[in-house]
Swiss-Prot record:
PANTHER family: GROWTH AND TRANSFORMATION-DEPENDENT PROTEIN (PTHR13674), PROTEIN FAM162B (PTHR13674:SF3). Residues 26-69 are annotated as: Disordered. This is Protein FAM162B. Pfam families: DUF1075. It is found in: Membrane. GO terms for cellular component: membrane. InterPro entries: DUF1075 (IPR009432). Its main location: membrane. The keyword Membrane applies.
Length: 162
């Protein structure tokens, strides 16, 4: 998070840089704020939500960093092995957890598609070898089909001429 307060520039993770006009550039490290207890909603400013109306100048908007997972998200969380059952999934989870689970699901789906593609390639190879044993080819099929069409066209022309 990047926030300017007076002549200080807070870069997040406790790093503060003094950047006022004429001030020497120095970086100080402040201890990072403690994480809230598990189960309570997190907020981007680190504090609890305030219901005092409009916020003043220089304050950060407090946005909840946890959200309710949809049924699809729950299925992805189960499929990727993050949780063992639907009952274990909490009502609110961090979006990073959902993103990580979606990425893992995407990779698993790609691996499945790669495997199916390899299986399909082997199936085509086997069927092509069997067709060669029967002396079948696309060229012979096309020639036979066109010969049949010519015969049908000739019969239709004879029937029309009568």
């Amino acid at each position: 998070m990047l926030r300017a307060v007076g002549s200080l520039l807070r870069l997040g993770r406790g790093l503060t840089v003094r950047c006022g006009p004429g001030a020497p550039l120095e970086a100080t490290r402040r201890p990072a704020p403690a994480l809230p207890p598990r189960g309570l909603p997190c907020y981007s400013s680190g504090g609890a939500p305030s219901n005092s109306g409009p916020q003043g100048h220089g304050e950060i908007h407090r946005v909840p960093t946890q959200r309710r997972p949809s049924q699809f998200d729950k299925k992805i969380l189960l499929w990727t092995g993050r949780f063992k059952s639907m009952e274990e999934i909490p009502p609110r989870i961090p979006p990073e957890m959902i993103d990580t689970a979606r990425n893992k699901a995407r990779v698993k789906a790609c691996y499945i598609m790669i495997g199916l593609t390899i299986i399909a390639c082997f199936a085509v190879i086997v069927s092509a070898k069997r067709a060669v044993e029967r002396h079948e080819s696309l060229t012979s099929w096309n020639l036979a089909k066109k010969a049949k069409w010519r015969e049908e066209a000739a019969l239709a022309a004879q029937a029309k001429a009568k």
